[in-house]
Every structure is written in structure tokens, then in C-alpha cells.
């Protein structure tokens, strides 16, 4: 029993070290350094969300803010199917669950990524599932996917093309040309600098 306990302790310490190096993401996350950077301007936990109540959008970040009426427990304990059902609600009473989880996945994107990642409606919408879902968005953007997987040369042009794809995915990320949000209003500066994104992308080469 002493040897088993020691082995479990080593495994536990190893897993903790892995989680720290992996920026709190699960083992399923392919690009944790990139995910950690881009989610800084999006969310804090896998349970974060926002929702529409009529024409008003309300948010709950890190357990603080408005509570979506249909959520009776943490978001990450529901199944993918249950999350989709809440995202399909009318924006009138009780309101429509909108952007969900660590990556703030909206309804149409969840359906698309679920199909791409081949995830069941019965899967729990926890860390592993959310990380698998976001992995599935990378191949949809060829410049980003080709750069991260080494299918193109590590040139400045290819790096900037990959960084632009990141800005297209996450509205809080700046474009390489002007560090402004791809999806924001004219002249709106992003909260995540494109140079930081490019540095992280380059670290995967």
C-alpha cells in the first residue's frame, strides 16, 4: 500500500504540474498557450456565460453578475444537448443563453464545432469537451492551421496571416495591420495585442 500511495502521489503531483504548465486547460487542449492568451479578453472560467433577456445582454463571469434563470447549477455540469437547448430559447422570458464557457461559444458555433469534433449531445460540457470543441475551430481557418501544424514556412507573412485568423475567431484580439478588433466598431482597439498573439503562435514552431 505504501508503494501504491507513493505512486498515486507522484501521479497527482505530475498532473498538477501539467495543469500549471497547461494554463489550467485540460489534457485535450492542443494549443493551451494560445487559448490562455485569447481568453483573457473573453472569460475566466469554463462556467462563464452571457444571455439575452429581451434586447438586453447580461453576463456572468467568474461567478459574478446576472444568473440565467434556467441554470440551476454550474454550466460545466450540463450536457452539450442541454446547453444547445438553452441556447435555442427565445430572447423573451426566460431569455436565450448566448456565449458559453471558457471560449464564449455562441449557438451556431457550438453546433458547427460539435459536428466537427464528433461530440455527442450526451457529453458533459466540462473542461475536456470545451477544449475539444475549440480545437475543432483551428482547422476551419487554413492560415492559422497551416502555420501551427508547420505546413507553411515560418515567414513574417505567414505568421501575420495566422494572427489575422486568430483575430477573426476572437473579437478581443487585434489585427496585425492596426491592432484593432476585426469584429469591433470602426477604430475600436482590441484588448489582446496582436504582437502577443504572434509571439505565442511563433512558440509553436
Show where each model-derived region lies.
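Single-pass alpha-helical membrane anchors
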Residues: 1-23
